[in-house]
């Protein structure tokens, strides 16, 4: 079947199981081919082909609400709802989003990108349905990895308490991104081997009903027997005790089993949890045999071999540079303990985990716990190294403030993917951390201009014993600069003048340093002399350099690959105001007040006006203003 001709999922209603099996093969072939060119979340989507088809056949989207947790497994859903013809633009600039998008389709009822949100959203929709008196089914689809998130467990508790009609589909592939961890994962493991839960439950209840109710004592005994047998025989008790009817485990690649259980779930009053077992990467051997999460999300690849088409780049990734520097330091510093919230591969911590298995903790999708775990370690003199993406640190804000910074604990936050990340789009852009961290007392924030300075900042963070410290670094590879053999501490709160100039000073850090230097070089040809300062410490700032600049009345331009509101430029403006420099000319460039969608980082920077050319244009608008005032 040509899946690009699909307009909506209604055609599934009249298809036979044999036809659906053929459709599954066509969809897998389509995904493998398209994603080999664009990259994307291939593993999760190959694993949910039959499940997604079954959901759209049994339910009536968009009337019935299919809510995809995390959303990276929504490609099959997009195909079945008429978007296959757009897959050449998947995750490309102005193209199809890699996640559910309400503006794309009426079938996308919930937007996401972070995990564990679907159940809370489903509960909200179910309450709204009941208040309005409508009858649609509410069906959140959540993975076993996302179910480890505290928010999901909070929602399970509320749904079970309120007894709302919600059908939760647990897509259990034993992996979220990397292999799942934790006690809840072990519970699911027991469930997988428990056989047909509902059959055992029904038989048990049938037998117990045949016990004659002669007197209260016998009835009480029968109830105790029932409870004991329930705990002994039925592993689904975890969900039953939360108030759910548990169905499964069900083969997520068997249409007959899926249809039988989905139709049965529709008849049950109250919340239902359907436990579906799927194989991540099914149908493509490199992805199917992946044990560590490499094929969760990828760039382009060769279909025949499974080899990734990596750009020619000999420089190490920023994640690798940071993790390997910490690993080297951990050989002599026994205080160092690494923590990751389910991102050991993305954060390049495999080497650390292999060398120091007793000092490496993957806590699962649990950013709040990871942060307070680090705080607890710090109270006992350890040096916790929390490797966390900027976008996911948002989920642990209270723990950063209340548990770490308020107690002034020595936690090292390694904030990965800081700045624009590109194809994953608005849910993953790491542009808010400066704004939500800068105003928190006791916290040091820094960002290097290159990987050599980066390794020295890692060393500085490990040696820093006066409170929490955060190192921001971007996604992707470094610049390929030579690394010093000996690590050194960088004095906290010191900046670095990279280029002298008399007409204007650019204050910037991180990825925008190279833009500023290039702009200054080109402006020099127009007789505009620009000073460039590496403002590597966002907090505390270098007050000496700031006073010198402000006293000289030189115009200042701040540049940051982060949101302007509450950002670094705002800090410079506050400093000038608070110290009485009310005539200072300070301009800011950065991320505007809107969410930045997907595309390459280069395309996005051009769209928001944050390139060398834009810097040159801005400087030329500032300098005449300065001359006119003179």
UniProtKB/Swiss-Prot annotation:
It catalyses: D-glyceraldehyde 3-phosphate + pyruvate + H(+) = 1-deoxy-D-xylulose 5-phosphate + CO2. It comes from the Bacteria. It is an enzyme of class 2 (transferase). Its cofactor is Mg(2+); thiamine diphosphate. One of its GO terms (biological process) is thiamine biosynthetic process. Keywords: Isoprene biosynthesis, Magnesium, Metal-binding, Thiamine biosynthesis, Thiamine pyrophosphate, Transferase. Gene3D superfamilies: 3.40.50.920, 3.40.50.970. Catalyzes the acyloin condensation reaction between C atoms 2 and 3 of pyruvate and glyceraldehyde 3-phosphate to yield 1-deoxy-D-xylulose-5-phosphate (DXP). Homodimer. Belongs to the transketolase family. DXPS subfamily. NCBIfam families: dxs (TIGR00204), PRK05444.2-2 (NF003933). This is 1-deoxy-D-xylulose-5-phosphate synthase. The gene is dxs.
């Amino acid at each position: 079947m040509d899946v690009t001709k699909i307009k909506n999922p209604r055609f599934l209603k009249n298809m036979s199981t044999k036809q659906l099996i053929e459709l599954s093969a066509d969809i897998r072939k389509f995904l493998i081919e398209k994603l080999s060119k664009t990259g994307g979340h291939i593993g999760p989507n190959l694993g949910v082909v039959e499940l997604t088809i079954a959901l759209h056949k049994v339910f009536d989207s968009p009337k019935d609400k299919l809510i995809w947790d995390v959303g990276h497994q929504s490609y099959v859903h997009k195909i079945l709802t008429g978007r296959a013809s757009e897959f050449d633009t998947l995750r490309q600039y102005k193209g199809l989003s890699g996640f559910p998008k309400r503006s794309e389709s009426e079938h996308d009822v919930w937007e996401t990108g972070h995990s564990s949100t679907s159940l809370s959203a489903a509960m909200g929709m179910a309450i709204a349905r009941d208040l309005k008196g409508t009858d649609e089914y509410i069906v959140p689809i959540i993975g076993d990895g996302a179910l480890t998130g505290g928010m999901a467990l909070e929602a399970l508790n509320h749904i079970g308490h309120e007894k709302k009609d919600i059908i939760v589909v647990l897509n259990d592939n034993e992996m979220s991104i990397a292999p799942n961890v934790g006690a809840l994962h072990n519970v699911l493991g027991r469930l997988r081997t428990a056989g047909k839960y509902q059959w055992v439950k029904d038989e048990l209840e049938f037998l117990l009903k045949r016990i004659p109710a002669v007197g209260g004592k016998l009835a009480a005994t029968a109830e105790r027997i029932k409870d004991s047998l329930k705990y002994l025989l039925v592993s689904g008790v975890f969900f039953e005790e939360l108030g759910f009817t548990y169905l499964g485990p069900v083969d997520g690649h068997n249409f007959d089993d899926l249809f039988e259980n989905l139709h049965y779930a529709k008849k049950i009053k109250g919340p239902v949890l359907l436990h579906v077992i799927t194989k991540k990467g099914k149908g493509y051997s490199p992805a199917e045999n992946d044990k560590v999460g490499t094929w969760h999300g990828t760039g382009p690849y060769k279909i025949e071999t499974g080899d990734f088409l990596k750009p020619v780049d000999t420089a190490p990734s920023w994640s690798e540079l940071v993790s390997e520097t910490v690993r080297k330091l951990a050989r002599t510093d026994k205080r160092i303990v690494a923590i990751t919230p389910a991102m050991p591969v993305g954060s390049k911590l495999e080497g650390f985990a292999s060398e120091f298995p007793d000092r490496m903790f993957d806590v699962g999708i649990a950013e709040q716990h990871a942060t307070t775990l680090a705080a607890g370690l710090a109270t006992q003199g350890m040096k916790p190294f929390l490797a966390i993406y900027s976008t996911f640190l948002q989920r642990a804000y209270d723990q950063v403030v209340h548990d770490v910074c308020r107690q002034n604990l020595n936690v090292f936050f390694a904030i990965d993917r800081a700045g624009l990340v590109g194809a994953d789009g608005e849910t993953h852009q790491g542009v808010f951390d400066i704004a939500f961290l800068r105003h928190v007392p006791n916290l040091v924030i820094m960002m290097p201009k290159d990987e050599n300075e980066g390794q020295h900042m890692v060393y500085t963070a490990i040696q820093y014993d006066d409170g929490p410290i955060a190192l921001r670094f971007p996604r992707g590879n470094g610049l390929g600069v030579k690394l010093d053999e000996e690590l050194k501490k960088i004095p906290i709160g010191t900046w670095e003048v990279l280029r002298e100039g008399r007409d204007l000073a650019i204050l910037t850090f991180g990825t925008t340093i190279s833009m500023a230097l290039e702009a200054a070089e080109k402006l020099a040809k127009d007789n505009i002399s620009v000073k460039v300062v590496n403002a590597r410490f966002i907090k505390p700032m270098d007050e000496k350099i700031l006073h010198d600049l402000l006293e000289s009345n030189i115009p200042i331009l701040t540049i940051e690959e982060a949101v302007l509101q509450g950002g670094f430029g705002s800090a410079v403006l506050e400093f000038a105001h608070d110290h009485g420099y009310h005539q200072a000319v300070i301009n800011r460039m950065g991320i505007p007040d809107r969410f930045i969608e997907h595309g390459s980082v280069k395309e996005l920077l051009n769209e928001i006006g944050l390139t060398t050319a834009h810097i040159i244009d801005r400087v030329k608008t500032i300098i005449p203003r300065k001359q006119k005032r003179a």
